[in-house]
A protein has these predicted regions:
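Cytosolic regulatory regions built on CNB/CRP/Popeye-like sensor folds
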Residues: 1-165, 176
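The conserved cystathionine-beta-synthase
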Residues: 169-179
């Protein structure tokens, strides 16, 4: 790639977290030299379940949707967002489909750089941990909203689940005697 293209890629990455918050510009610059660029048309799958992923994807332009195995929409992502990290944290094993919903220009960051930054840079790893935490919170909120019960099983006291008193024995009774 020409130096102008590399500079543009570096400038773009540095506008978005976690790259904008990292204190190691020389490493990000080295990484940019190893990026791949991919153009994907609207409707094309980018990552499919039961395959191996070797990249962290940065959306330079366009939008994608993340689908569960049953084609259920999990979320939409757009310019400046990253995907593919969940599979990289599972040694590349893909469980969700990522599909373009607009024509996309993607930067593909090799897994080696993702793993290096994830291990060596707290800002980088905390960024992805916060995303995972927020996704879990969103899933739990959705479960609570869809629950037909007055009390969610995820947050209710154990006492409220008991229908009869618990069985107990003295502490000097052996397991064999209790059985």
């Amino acid at each position: 790639m020409m130096e102008v293209e590399l500079t543009e890629m570096l400038d773009t990455l540095n506008q978005y977290p976690p790259f904008s918050e990292m204190q190691e510009p020389h490493l990000i610059e080295q990484m940019v030299h190893e990026l791949e660029i991919q153009y994907v048309r609207n409707g094309e799958s980018i990552i499919v379940p039961n395959t191996m992923n070797e990249f962290l994807y940065f959306i330079r332009s366009g939008a994608v949707e993340v689908l569960a195995n049953n084609e259920q929409l999990l979320r939409r992502m757009e310019e400046g967002e990253l995907f593919g990290y969940l599979s990289l944290l599972r040694d590349g094993k893909v469980t969700q489909e990522i599909k373009a919903i607009e024509d996309c220009l993607l930067y593909l960051i090799p897994a080696t750089w993702f793993k290096r930054f994830y291990v060596e840079n707290d800002v980088f790893s905390e960024f992805f941990e916060l995303i995972r935490e927020n996704r879990l919170r969103t899933a739990l909120d959705a479960q609570n909203q869809n629950s037909n019960q007055d009390v969610s099983l995820m947050t209710c006291p154990v006492k409220s689940l008991l229908r009869r008193p618990p069985i107990s024995i003295e502490d000097n009774v052996s397991i064999q005697q209790a059985a």
